[in-house]
Amino acid sequence: MSAMGWTLLAAALLAISAQSNGCYIQNCPRGGKRAVETELHSCAACGLGGQCVGPSICCGGLLGGGRGGGCIVGGPLSAPCKRENLHPEPCRPGGGSSCGLEGICAAPGICCTDVTCSIDATCDDVTEKAGVTFSGATGGLANPTGDLLRKVLLLANADLE
């Protein structure tokens, strides 16, 4: 084989390997990368009856004053969520309905991704039936505690940006 043939072969192998999406040994799910969609489990419990939504986000339960739930970003109440992040299989928060670009409704009026939460009107109807246990029924953020939660959440997101 000529030098040009070896060069073309090397370039073809390089192009093929650049297009492949392998998973590293430490983060490959059981059953390989294609098994991810089928092996979802419920996310860990955290806080005061809440559920992990991301590596440092705990939502639901008695958070937010016990009136419809709320979310805590960071702190000791979300500590179990860091351990959940080390699980080889991904988890699916029980929030149910989608919101934003890639988020789920984690509490009434609150949309969370795995990194941050924001106020979202499409999540105002979130109740216990959606999957996350909230202590209130509907409209949980239409109260003084909920208003304070909204302000704290807006300030926290402003600090992150």
Curated annotation (Swiss-Prot):
The record ties this protein, via SMART domains, to:
NH
The family database entries (SUPFAM superfamilies) matched by this protein are listed as: Neurophysin II
User: Which keywords describe this protein according to UniProt?
Assistant: Amidation, Cleavage on pair of basic residues, Disulfide bond, Hormone, Secreted, Signal
Q: Which cysteines form disulfides?
A: C23-C28, C43-C91, C46-C58, C52-C81, C59-C71, C99-C111, C105-C123, C112-C117
From the UniProt annotation, give the residues forming the signal peptide: 1-22
- A cellular component term, taken from the record's GO annotations: extracellular space
Localisation per UniProt entry: Secreted
The record, for Pfam families, names:
Hormone_4, Hormone_5
**An example Gene Ontology molecular-function term:** neurohypophyseal hormone activity
In terms of Gene3D superfamilies, this protein maps to: Neurohypophysial hormone domain
Q: Which residues carry this modification: Glycine amide?
A: G31
Q: Does the keyword Lipid metabolism apply?
A: no
The family annotation for this protein states: Belongs to the vasopressin/oxytocin family.
Protein function: Vasotocin is an antidiuretic hormone.
Task: Kindly provide the name given to this protein in its UniProt entry.
Answer: Vasotocin-neurophysin VT
